[in-house]
């Protein structure tokens, strides 16, 4: 039986005004912002650990963060670690104004002559529009692409994968952290129990959860990249078994180890 508290909260979230959502995100109430917003140092370390484990480096590299959230902290940290340039793409970002006090540690990264301070275009490019706009500028391709808990919110992942591939230089590396859980964390697999029509009409939040599984991401990225690998970061087999009989067949492979996965790192190159 479907949990009543889940259904009530999902419907409320579905129809919650965007202004209220933004307010709750800013204050960290009920709806949690992404790690780049609430813990940027941890986000930077997560990216760096993945890059270093792959034998790669940010030194002299042009890096794209797909869905940066609005804060520049991770971009600044990457530049501090030796990156040549950072491109930030997010059509839904809530930009955090950069004051002189915040800009000062960045040294020559900002032009602090006005308020808010503005990143120097030779070091940071900010695109508050879909990735296609960056591609339309015919700017330099990037060497590394990073994202954290972004792809599960994308409506057209196939299109996003194609555009990300187009933005990447030959030999470029992708590191995408993907959260496969229902974002109502008490019920990590509950969203998989509903038909597409019911989910889209009544339960899908304004931030969109596409409900794609590991095999979907593997298929979509393999269509545009020569190499794709998925590292499991977490799984919840007990929670999966509790709702296994209710999960719709299109979300199942029959392999519990794969079906119970909740968080992954997808690499593509």
Indicate residue ranges for each PLM-predicted region.
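Class I SAM-dependent methyltransferase SAM/SAH-binding core
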Residues: 73-134
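A C-terminal cap/extension of S-adenosyl-L-methionine-dependent methyltransferases
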Residues: 126, 219, 228-269
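A short acidic, Gly/Pro-enriched loop at the edge of an enzyme's catalytic core
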Residues: 132-145
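Hydrophobic beta-strand segment of the Class I
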Residues: 145-146, 175
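A short glycine-rich, Lys/Arg-flanked "PGG" loop and its adjoining helix->strand segment in the class I
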Residues: 158-173
């Amino acid at each position: 039986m479907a949990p009543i508290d889940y259904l009530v909260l999902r419907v409320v979230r579905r129809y919650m005004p965007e202004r209220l959502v933004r307010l709750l995100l800013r204050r960290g109430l009920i709806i949690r912002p992404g790690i780049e917003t609430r813990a940027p140092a941890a986000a930077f370390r997560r990216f760096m650990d993945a890059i270093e484990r792959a034998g790669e480096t940010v030194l002299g590299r042009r890096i794209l963060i797909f869905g940066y959230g609005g804060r520049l902290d991770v971009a600044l940290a990457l530049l501090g670690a030796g990156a040549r340039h950072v491109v930030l793409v997010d059509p839904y970002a809530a930009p955090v104004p950069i004051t002189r006090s915040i800009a000062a540690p960045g040294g020559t990264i900002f032009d602090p002559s006005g308020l808010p301070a503005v990143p120097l275009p030779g070091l940071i490019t900010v695109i508050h529009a879909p990735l296609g706009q960056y591609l339309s500028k015919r700017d330099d391709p990037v060497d590394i692409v990073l994202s954290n808990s972004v792809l599960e919110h994308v409506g057209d992942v196939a299109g996003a994968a194609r555009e990300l591939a187009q933005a990447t230089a030959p030999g470029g590396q992708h590191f995408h952290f993907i959260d496969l859980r229902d974002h109502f964390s008490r019920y990590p697999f509950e969203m998989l129990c509903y038909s597409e029509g019911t989910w889209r009409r009544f339960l899908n939040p304004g931030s969109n959860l596409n409900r794609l599984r590991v095999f979907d991401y593997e298929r979509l990225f393999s269509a545009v990249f020569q190499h794709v690998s998925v590292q499991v970061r977490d799984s919840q087999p007990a929670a999966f078994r509790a709702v296994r009989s209710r999960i719709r067949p299109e979300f199942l492979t029959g392999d519990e180890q794969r079906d119970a996965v909740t968080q992954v790192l997808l690499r593509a190159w």
